[in-house]
């Protein structure tokens, strides 16, 4: 990773780490790097519901237009919507302003290429070099010269060559209609509770389901700029579990702040995580002959039960590092199209280029309609081994390499040898060390994982 770009773009506390000045520089450098061959780059810009989104959007637009780019703001829309619209509108690039499932104080800036995919590391590194002044001069010096270039070496167009802002008024409808086109059935007779996390899906998700015939109950779909992910959404599905039972719904669908992930709840109020969603969809696609290469890509965080369920069905599994970008790389490399993460980032590459929580919900409901089976029965196709994940906040994620920490991890692995596993990794977006364990005995598993977590808590 670079100094600015992490596993999912640039993130930080808005107006403190991720400042308007930095957003301006990212917009300016990003538009230039991504559009060297375009006479006037066109950049789609979307955001979630965070209060800082407007501030950062204004700065990004200023940066984009300052190099002659055309800014196409689409307003509040899920991250995968930006990826889709970048392709649909034949734009040069797309930018999302969101920190996904992070707290409201955080925000982020992530770029998509013209094809709707996340940027390769090399391209992010080039943008970063311009922003940090490691390529030419620092972008702190923004005065132009007589030859139409700024002191940073980037274009300084004047007059009619300055970029324009052209809002896309029908952006939401374009995305909604596309998502509806991926569904071969209607959802009449289904009652669905949607938890929008007070985020980017708060309008889109309920609208699509209603237009497809479902009866929809919404919770946490009233954003006020400060309540995104606040005790709700895919990282806090407890309210959704209660609501599904209270309303007698067939299923609950929980998104995160930018709606690139989905966690479901069955009719009994039980959580159905990304692993079980993937097993449900993969087995259905395999039965219909619609699973390319009979292959699914998952990360090392996926439960061992997923491996057993898919292998029984003759499905090949590609295992990657944690992060949907690595799942994507594996799928593209192998010519496959389906995979994801236990956290609910799930990719259907035949439909979109990135994890899409709303799309995943539609595909899951399609399985319910086509099989006539309740979600509890479909999810039971995978027997989940006991798994425990503990997140430990640390000052320096480098503590993973400390001898004391490594000794604790090795001791834990030794205790579960042959019966389970331990996986310890740093978060790519937060100052956390994640300690995950799987094993047959929940009590023993808790003791082993907590012993490791206690060591990290000392750092």
From Swiss-Prot:
UniProt similarity note: Belongs to the phosphohexose mutase family.
PTM notes: Activated by phosphorylation.
InterPro entries, A to Z: A-D-PHexomutase_a/b/a-I, A-D-PHexomutase_a/b/a-I/II/III, A-D-PHexomutase_a/b/a-II, A-D-PHexomutase_a/b/a-III, A-D-PHexomutase_C, A-D-PHexomutase_C_sf, A-D-PHexomutase_CS, Alpha-D-phosphohexomutase_SF
Entry-linked HAMAP family: GlmM_B
Keywords: Isomerase, Magnesium, Metal-binding, Phosphoprotein
Residues recorded with modification Phosphoserine: 100
EC number: 5.4.2.10
Function description: Catalyzes the conversion of glucosamine-6-phosphate to glucosamine-1-phosphate.
Gene label: glmM
One BP annotation, GO: carbohydrate metabolic process
Residues that hold Mg(2+) according to the record: 100, 256, 258, 260
Classification via SUPFAM superfamilies: Phosphoglucomutase, C-terminal domain (SSF55957), Phosphoglucomutase, first 3 domains (SSF53738)
GO molecular function, one term: phosphoglucosamine mutase activity
Cofactor(s) needed by this chain: Mg(2+)
The protein, known as: Phosphoglucosamine mutase
Pfam family, one: PGM_PMM_I
NCBIfam families noted in UniProt: glmM, PRK10887.1
Superkingdom, taxonomy of origin: Bacteria
């Amino acid at each position: 990773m670079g100094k600015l770009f992490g596993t999912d773009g640039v993130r930080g506390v808005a107006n403190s780490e991720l400042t308007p000045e930095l957003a301006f520089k990212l917009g300016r450098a990003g538009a230039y790097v991504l559009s060297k061959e375009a006479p006037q780059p066109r950049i789609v810009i979307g955001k979630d519901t965070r209060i800082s989104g407007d501030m950062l959007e204004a700065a990004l637009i200023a940066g984009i237009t300052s190099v002659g780019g055309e800014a196409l703001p689409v307003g509040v829309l899920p991250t995968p919507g930006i990826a889709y619209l970048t392709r649909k509108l034949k734009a040069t690039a797309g930018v999302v302003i969101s920190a996904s499932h992070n707290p409201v104080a955080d925000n982020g800036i992530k770029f998509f290429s013209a094809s709707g995919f996340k940027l390769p590391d090399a391209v992010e590194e080039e943008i970063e070099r311009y922003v940090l002044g490691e390529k030419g001069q620092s972008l702190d010096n923004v005065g132009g010269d007589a030859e139409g270039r700024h002191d940073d070496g980037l274009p300084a167009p004047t007059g009619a060559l300055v970029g324009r802002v052209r809002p896309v008024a029908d952006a939401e409808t374009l995305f909604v209609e596309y998502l509806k086109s991926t569904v071969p059935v209607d959802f009449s007779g289904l009652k669905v509770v949607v938890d929008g996390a007070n985020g980017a899906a708060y309008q889109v998700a309920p609208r699509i389901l209603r237009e497809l015939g479902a009866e929809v109950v919404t919770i946490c779909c009233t954003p006020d700029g400060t309540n995104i992910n606040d005790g709700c959404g895919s990282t806090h599905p407890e309210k959704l579990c209660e609501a599904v039972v209270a309303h007698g719904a067939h299923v609950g669908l929980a998104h995160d702040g930018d709606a690139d992930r989905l966690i479901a709840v069955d009719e009994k109020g039980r959580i159905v995580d990304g692993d079980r969603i993937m097993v449900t969809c993969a087995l259905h696609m395999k039965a219909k002959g619609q699973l390319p290469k009979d292959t699914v890509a998952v990360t090392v965080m996926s439960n061992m039960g997923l491996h057993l369920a898919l292998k029984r069905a003759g499905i090949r599994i590609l295992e990657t590092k944690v992060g949907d970008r690595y799942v994507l790389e594996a799928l593209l490399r192998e010519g496959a199209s389906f995979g994801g993460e236990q956290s609910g980032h799930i990719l259907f590459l035949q439909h979109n280029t990135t994890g899409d929580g709303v799309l995943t919900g539609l595909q899951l409901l399609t399985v319910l309609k086509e099989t006539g089976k309740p979600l509890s029965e479909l999810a039971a196709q995978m027997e989940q081994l006991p798994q425990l994940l503990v997140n430990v906040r640390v000052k320096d994620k480098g503590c993973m390499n400390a001898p004391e920490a490594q000794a604790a991890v090795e001791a834990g692995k030794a205790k579960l040898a042959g019966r389970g596993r331990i996986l310890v990794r740093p978060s790519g977006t937060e100052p956390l060390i994640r300690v995950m364990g799987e094993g047959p005995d929940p009590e023993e598993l808790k003791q082993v994982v907590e012993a490791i977590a206690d060591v990290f808590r000392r750092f």
